[in-house]
Amino acid sequence: VSALIVLAIISIVQCNFLIGQPLSMGFAPQRNYIFILVSYFTIRKLIALDKIDINTVVNGLLFCGVLSVIIYWLQVNLIDYVQFVHVYKAARVTRLYVDSFMCVIIGFLGLSKYLEENNKKYLFFVAIELVYELIIGQSRLELASVVLGYAVMILLMKRLSFRKICMILIGVIAVVVFINSAFFERFNEALQMQFYNTTTGIDTMAIRKVARDEFVRQLKQSPATLIFGCGYPNIGYSGTASTAYIAVGNERIGLVDNGIFAFVYVYGLLGASVVIKWFYKLYKSAWKLYKIKNIYWPLGFVISLTILLYNITFWWNKPSWTWGMVFLMCYMEHKLNDELDEEK
């Protein structure tokens, strides 16, 4: 966490040095990210002092996640009559772009509890999460990452049983349904553009390719940019129109849709090394929790986040996801420390 905070500070100075962007403008778009990362130390301390009960937080996430999905689902169905959730909506489809951590985490928590306790009521949370993916979020990559995270959790069940086989079959059926849906058609169109360039005009895949080529070009300008990145650009600063937010047709490139590529553009190879080390530690802790305490959700969740990295770094761009990563780290450290205390 400390390394991520240091990276953010370096990026503020770096962008000022390279294009003259004021330090305050480099800090402004990262303020939520930085403050939430700093909160890790306070939250971790409060958990250690028993001021925060981790199980109460989990139950709160389950409740708030279900409530969020219900509210968003109602908005999707009533979008032609009233708008009470003020978020960006896709023009062509009824897709809401929301800060979705609570909507997604309930599926992993619910499936984990089901695998641990064999209580079917927890599958309700998985179903609710899939409602979010299919009706509200409609993100192909996010859906694929969640399903693969679930699949790994199921395959790691320590008891090979009829129940396990049935759940795997359900997963296969879900994949078949997905392949025959409109979602897959749009996914296939994106692949055609990426690999065969068979569609016309500018779409998101084409914009991403332009962005990534431009990011690489700028990183290679000097050893300093390669190591420390190009800094965090504020879209409100005019100088970024020729660096991070270049126009492509009627659109322009940006950071949000370029995942780990944008992260490396901002923080350089130093940032890439920090993320690699961070995710290694996350995997190591999640695997220990699974092996020692039979807790599945951290591993499935980290796998899902890893798959998303190609296009999406929610934990960097969205406050609830940044907090979610802080919670994940605090949760795993607390559970593993409890195990060490029991051994003593």
Q: Which residues make up each language-model segment?
A:
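Transmembrane signal-anchor hairpin modules in multi-pass inner-membrane enzymes, especially those
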Residues: 1-10, 48, 52-59, 113-121, ...
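Aromatic-anchored transmembrane helix interface
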Residues: 1-12, 20-45, 60
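Alpha-helical transmembrane segments of multi-pass inner-membrane proteins
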Residues: 55-81, 94-156
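Transmembrane alpha-helices of multi-pass inner-membrane enzymes
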Residues: 108-109, 300-344
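Hydrophobic transmembrane alpha-helices and their immediate junctions
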Residues: 119, 163-164, 266-308
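A membrane-periplasm/extracellular boundary helix in multi-pass inner-membrane enzymes
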Residues: 136-137, 157-199, 219-221
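Long extracytoplasmic/lumenal interhelical loops at the membrane interface
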Residues: 202-267
